[in-house]
């Protein structure tokens, strides 16, 4: 019954299955006469022989197909069985008779027994339908019967599988075996039947077989971690139940580390260096197409690569442009000097984020930014691109990068250089004073006590231009030496550290003044400073303003002025200050009080007293009044800042550091109004502090 149903594989043979009477006769074959030959010398006899051989081959193939169809009918299983409910209905059972003595002997009896069961069930179903209907679901399983009855029943476990599973249907022949599905497909769904049981083969070879004359280096396997105490791989050494053997543990640990080093000898303590990477990829160069790359792209050396035409539309590669970019540290250095030109507001920070490029790193791409070599056609129309652009040429692109991305140190040409600025400009005055005062400050002793107010006033002092008219000098002061500004085209003055200037200044100082006269001039300077301090106390400005000279004028002692300063540094400062208007006190009402000129201060520095140079400049207070400002910066030079009451001139000079008065904006003073309970707390706990362990140890040491 089941053998008549086939899977459908017979349809493969339908194109070759023709009845004998339906075989068409060849109508296109025409033979010539026997005496006629073909142009190639082939006669009809040979053609007939070939045709006969072909017909014999066809007959053999048809006979072979018939044999295969017969075998296919034998090997195939029933298919096309449709089951309404797969949980309640299905094939009765599946029996596979293997090559066994029992199956050969009881083959017929087993088939008859199954047929009798089916007939008896059909008869019961006709007589009583209710008895044959079971409420319980069938138990789909396949049981493997063991032939060995000596095994105890307690140990025997039934190997139950799901319904319709493949137990195995392998047909073994002499030279091959055929593994055919032994279970019919249920509802044409192969998922209801399990797949094949893939056999597991034992590994015969454990080593790689190499070719003749070649040696294969097999990487040693990393040893498995084990207990160094007992050698077991099931637990670690900390969980070992055996007593510890220190000698064995150290020996096994050493063997394990040596084995790990041999297994990972290539990657053990290996470092990567940039030179190795460069050597590895050094043969690849941008813009250069090797023969291997040409073969990979399918182009020759007589044509441009396709990506060149695409680059004309997209532009220069951004990745290689990034390689040509010069890196900037991004650090900004503020030295306190005014480098602005009045274009930025006070307190504004100028961030220089300019990007520069190294033009030598620009890549040459023939056909894109340089001309195409001779003999290579420009096929931009075929690739749907554009012709070479003049703006993409290498020299044009380099000029664009140079003009639009300048170096950080290059300034624009619209700013005036310092040589063309007027000698009396405030900016030049500040630069000259800083350049003259800084060498003297650098050579002072670092352990000297410097007033705090002088440091703050030096770092935050404001330097307006000189006043229009000058007040008279104090009594007993020799007239200053006026040096008019040099006209344009005149060579500069002789440097102050030149031998001629140093010799002349030294001769005047040594012959003109004695030690008593120098001490008298020093007393006059101190008297002028004390009177300036009294003027500051009468003004409305706060006493602790960093721009005033109160803390400076009252703090230094004569010992602080006895500082060794080189003669060249002092004369240099004097020479730089001479082209300007003489520095004087700007308080017109106090005409009789001022400091001595620079020549006297220079002579003080060159004697044994070694006094510091004094620049008689005035300090500008917040209320507009001018007082002398004795600024001993780093314990060195004394500087009096010139004053100007014009606010318009003061606002034009900018500093990268805000004014000191702006640091206290929005800060309210703490008046200690609600601190009545907190006062006197130290007096209350002083007795406890005396009994502290630290004080007790000190008392013990003192008593010992």
From Swiss-Prot:
One of its GO terms (biological process) is mRNA 3'-end processing. Residues 16-33 have a biased composition (Basic and acidic residues). One of its GO terms (molecular function) is zinc ion binding. Residues 16-43, 407-516, 529-599 are annotated as: Disordered. A zinc finger (CCHC-type) spans 225-242. Residues 284-297, 307-322 are annotated as: RBM7 binding. Component of a nuclear TRAMP-like complex, an ATP-dependent exosome regulatory complex consisting of a helicase (MTREX), an oligadenylate polymerase (TENT4B or TENT4A), and a substrate specific RNA-binding factor (ZCCHC7 or ZCCHC8). Several TRAMP-like complexes exist with specific compositions and are associated with nuclear, or nucleolar RNA exosomes. Identified in the spliceosome C complex. Component of the nuclear exosome targeting (NEXT) complex composed of MTREX, ZCCHC8, and RBM7 that directs a subset of non-coding short-lived RNAs for exosomal degradation. This is Zinc finger CCHC domain-containing protein 8. It comes from Pongo abelii.
């Amino acid at each position: 019954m089941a053998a008549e149903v086939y899977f459908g594989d017979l349809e493969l043979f339908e194109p070759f299955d023709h009845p004998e009477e339906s075989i068409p006769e060849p109508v296109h074959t025409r033979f010539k006469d026997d005496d006629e030959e073909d142009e190639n010398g082939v006669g009809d006899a040979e053609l007939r022989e070939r045709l006969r051989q072909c017909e014999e081959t066809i007959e053999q193939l048809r006979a072979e197909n018939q044999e295969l169809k017969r075998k296919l009918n034998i090997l195939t299983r029933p298919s096309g069985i449709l089951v309404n409910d797969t949980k309640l209905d299905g094939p009765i059972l599946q029996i596979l008779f293997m090559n066994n003595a029992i199956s050969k002997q009881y083959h017929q009896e087993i088939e008859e027994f199954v047929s009798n069961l089916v007939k008896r069930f059909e008869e019961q179903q006709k007589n009583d339908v209710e008895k044959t209907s079971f409420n319980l679901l069938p138990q789909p399983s396949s049981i493997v019967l063991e032939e060995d009855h000596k095994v105890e029943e307690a140990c025997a476990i039934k190997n139950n599988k799901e319904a319709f599973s493949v137990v195995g249907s392998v047909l073994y022949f002499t030279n091959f075996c055929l593994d055919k599905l032994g279970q019919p497909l249920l509802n044409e769904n192969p998922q209801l039947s399990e797949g094949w049981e893939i056999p597991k083969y034992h590994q015969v070879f454990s080593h790689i077989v190499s070719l003749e004359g070649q040696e294969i280096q097999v990487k040693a396997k990393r040893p498995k971690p084990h207990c160094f105490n007992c050698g077991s791989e099931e637990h670690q050494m900390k969980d070992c139940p055996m007593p510890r053997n220190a000698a064995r543990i150290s020996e096994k640990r050493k063997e394990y580390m040596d084995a790990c080093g041999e297994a990972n000898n290539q990657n053990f303590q290996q470092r990567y260096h940039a030179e190795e990477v460069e050597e590895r990829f050094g043969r690849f160069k941008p813009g250069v197409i090797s023969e291997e790359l040409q073969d990979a792209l399918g182009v020759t050396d007589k044509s441009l690569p396709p990506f060149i035409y695409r680059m004309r539309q997209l532009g220069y590669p951004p990745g290689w442009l990034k390689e040509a970019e010069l890196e900037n540290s991004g650090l900004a250095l503020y030295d306190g000097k005014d480098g602005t030109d009045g274009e930025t507001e006070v307190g504004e920070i100028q961030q220089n984020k300019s990007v520069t490029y190294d033009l030598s790193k620009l890549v040459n791409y023939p056909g894109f930014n340089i001309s195409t070599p001779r003999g290579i056609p420009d096929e931009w129309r075929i690739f749907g691109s554009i012709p070479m652009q003049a703006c993409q040429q290498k020299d044009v692109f380099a000029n664009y990068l140079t003009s639009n991305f300048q170096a950080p140190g290059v300034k624009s040409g619209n700013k005036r250089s310092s040589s063309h600025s007027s000698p009396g400009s405030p900016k030049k005055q500040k630069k000259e004073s800083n350049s003259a005062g800084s060498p003297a400050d650098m050579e002072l002793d670092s352990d000297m006590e410097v007033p705090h107010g002088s440091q703050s006033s030096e770092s935050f002092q404001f330097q307006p231009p000189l006043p229009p008219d000058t007040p008279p000098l104090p009594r007993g002061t020799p007239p200053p030496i006026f040096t008019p500004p040099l006209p344009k085209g005149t060579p500069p003055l002789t440097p102050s550290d030149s031998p001629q200037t140093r010799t002349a200044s030294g001769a005047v100082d040594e012959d003109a003044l004695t030690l008593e006269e120098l001490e008298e001039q020093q007393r006059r300077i101190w008297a002028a400073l004390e009177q300036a301090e009294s003027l500051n106390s009468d003004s409305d400005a706060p006493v602790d303003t960093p721009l005033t000279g109160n803390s400076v004028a009252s703090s230094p002692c004569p010992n602080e002025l006895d500082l060794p300063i080189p003669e060249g540094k002092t004369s240099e400062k004097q020479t730089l200050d001479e082209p300007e208007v003489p520095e004087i006190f700007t308080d017109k009402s106090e005409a009789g009080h001022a400091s001595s000129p620079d020549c006297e201060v220079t002579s003080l520095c060159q004697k044994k007293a070694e006094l510091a140079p004094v620049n008689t400049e005035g300090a500008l207070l917040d209320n507009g009044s001018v007082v002398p400002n004795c600024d001993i910066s780093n314990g060195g030079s004394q500087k009096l800042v010139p004053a100007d009451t014009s606010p318009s001139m003061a606002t034009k000079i900018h500093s990268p550091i805000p004014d000191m008065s702006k640091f206290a904006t929005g800060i309210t003073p703490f008046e200690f109004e609600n601190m009545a309970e907190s006062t006197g707390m130290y007096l209350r706990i002083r007795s406890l502090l005396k009994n502290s362990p630290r004080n007790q140890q000190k008392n013990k040491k003192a008593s010992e």
